[in-house]
Amino acid sequence: MSACAASLSPHQVPTTTTHDVVVVGNGPIGSAVARHVAAAGASVCVIDGRDSLTSAWNDEGRIVRPLDAEGRSCWQSWNLESLEGFPALQAESGVEFFTKCGSLACGTEAWVANPVKRLTEAGVDFTWHENGTAVEKRFPYLSVPQTHVAVSDAAGGFVNPKRMIQAQNIVMMMTAAGNEMTRVGDDETRRDNSDEGNDDTRRGNSNGPFEKENAFANKNLVVLESAVAVRAANGESPFVETAEGGARVAKLVVLAGGAYIKALAKVSGLTATTKSGSNNQQVSLDASVGVASIRLSRRTVLLAEVTSNEATSTLKHMPTVKYQWAPSENSGCDDQSNSSATTPAQTSTSTHGANEQMSVYVLPPIRYPGPDPPQGWYVKIGGGANDFFDDDTDENNTVEALREWMAGSGDDAVADRLHEVLVSLMPRTNFLTLVTKPCVTTCTADGELQIEKLGPDGAVVAVSGCQGKAAGPADAIGRAVARQVVETLKEQAGRGG
């Protein structure tokens, strides 16, 4: 339900089409799911709602690193798998989207211990920095407490999510159903991203959305439409109703619309699919698990401008940074909720949320093309305690609240705190213009991604609970979801569906 793909010229796509799989959402995960499902031979239609909904990932940089800040093995595996797969995806699509600048995690020894353990187990090369002096010697633009330690690696970096989605879309549509080649803006995209040696290009100097589409019904394609409901009746093919009056029919529908999934599932009246012996059983969505357990958190990011000279000299080799700025604050993320409505799932402590509350992430200077923010080089910082939306509101109010938040400029108080942390961390950097941006994350009590089957026979698969860190490893997450999708398609075929 979010976006960066193609316009519908010169060929208009029929309003009703039939595909093996319809993916609602053309963000980092949705585009990856679509590409990997297409690679298995299925026909795919991606519904891209960028004209009606604002996405949280719509930025120039998202971190991806070989460690997970909370030391979770599944997230680390996705990080590593995605990092390994980036070169092939970039080569096949002709789109450069990954900047390999390394990553750094800095905090108390106890805070860094779990990531170090996971890096060691995964066989990832890293450097240990024994105190604040060692950190500052290696990274002279940083200033951290003497009691802090750090671990750094050379494998991590950041992705430009808009370019990564382009790459996924191009490869998906090159892998057209029936072994026919369908390209979308391929040649133009290759020209836009061919300057590999240019530092501006390497760090994100182009939005580069597709300019044209030549995909037809029943081939792999992206359509600029808005999903308003998903219909899944027993014994019938599921389909997605669009605001444009069309229907995208499929054997299976994947919901990958980020913050909008929960509202879409509820307004569609979808039920959860559970196993009862050898049969599927439909039950109401459970607020303690799966999609219904997702909580939406308002997030604010700060973009701090630096001069082009500083970006390309002093800070040229700066890694991404995860920094524990408040070691004494160790309560769970949900303690900071502004919602009066609570459930057991909502009040339980999340390791991820607790970690976020006491830490920030920082990206090295990235060149933003303008106009918002104005063209220039910016260091980005975000993190801190969650600020949850009210769970009591109905689906329409939730979507409207999301629209209003994403149309604003974030929380000024949070931005002020982020600025204080950034200046303390990088006191020798001359920051110029400050720009605040809104973001939203989908959180769960256990900090894990949610993949849930909905509707009769599990014909709808919902993916959510990204915890604010799924854009970087989205390729591997998409591959994992695609495996489940393909397996479900095989089960349907076995039943004669």
Spell out what each predicted region is.
Residues 29, 52, 260:
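Conserved Rossmann-like nucleotide-cofactor binding loop
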Residues 183-188, 215-238:
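A conserved short coil-to-beta-strand element within the FAD-binding core of flavoproteins
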Residues 38-57:
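Glycine-rich FAD pyrophosphate-binding loop
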Residues 61-138, 147-149, 359-360:
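Dinucleotide-binding Rossmann-like beta1-alpha1 core, especially the glycine-rich loop
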Residues 418-497:
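C-terminal catalytic lobe of FAD-dependent flavoproteins
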